[in-house]
């Protein structure tokens, strides 16, 4: 496999993961049958396609790192995320769709580029995880600035005042450079209230240790939609959604987690009671003008699917 073929392969794996996540009928999220005001499924589908070139570039840079043709500090994760955010905005009109997902995916793309592939073009996930850690810990202050610019481009909701280096404060970018604050350090500040940042800082524990193993076990005996929805519920039941917490408070996020746990305990999509409970849960999440949309849980579900596709899974 040539460098170009490998980087394209990685990009396709990540695009597919986004498409599979979006297509699943997860409660409170946008899917093929339910949307938000101004944001529908087609916006997410367009976003997945638009993200492809940046994923491919990230993977290619990872390949160059492995060949000692590029320093790992020169990968430019922040710039890659910014470019990806701009491409996504140019290709759809539904506002911010997958910023959290591309923040999680970009280090994965670089890490996969750094790793050798097996005969079936799958990746060793233990090595992938080590490479992710190297990539995120090698970020720079310039990566931080570019990430802040990516947030400006995507304009996500739910941004509250941060304890330090607030992304909505124009002065923060100057401080990032002046104080030489790497993107890893920025995410460390935010890791206590944002699970996407927490994944970066703690080497993707929810993705690798909870979501992916559970998803793979589900896929052994269940259809894809059921497996993805159940994985989403499993994550949500154990990790109160930080997107919800930032919008409406930790107490409400905890309540949503308990509801997700109850749906799973009733059998989820495999029993009549579980299906009824899931429908009620979905309706409840949509009542508050989608302020209870488990958006971070969707990002983590997508990350688990990315590990699946990089491991060789195909629908």
Mark where each language-model region is.
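Phosphate-rich cofactor/ligand-interacting catalytic cores and adjacent structured alpha/beta frameworks
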Residues: 1-75, 112-288, 308-315
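Active-site cofactor/substrate anionic-group-binding motifs, chiefly glycine-
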Residues: 71-92
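Generic internal hydrophobic packing segments that stabilize the cores of diverse globular domains
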Residues: 78-85, 102-105, 129
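Residue-level detector of well-ordered alpha-helical segments, enriched
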Residues: 80, 100-104, 147, 224-231, ...
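A broadly conserved amphipathic alpha-helix scaffold signal in soluble, globular proteins
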Residues: 86, 106-110, 133
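Amphipathic alpha-helical interaction segments
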Residues: 88-95, 99, 112-119
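Conserved phosphate/anionic-ligand binding catalytic regions in large, soluble enzymes, centered on
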Residues: 92-107, 290-306
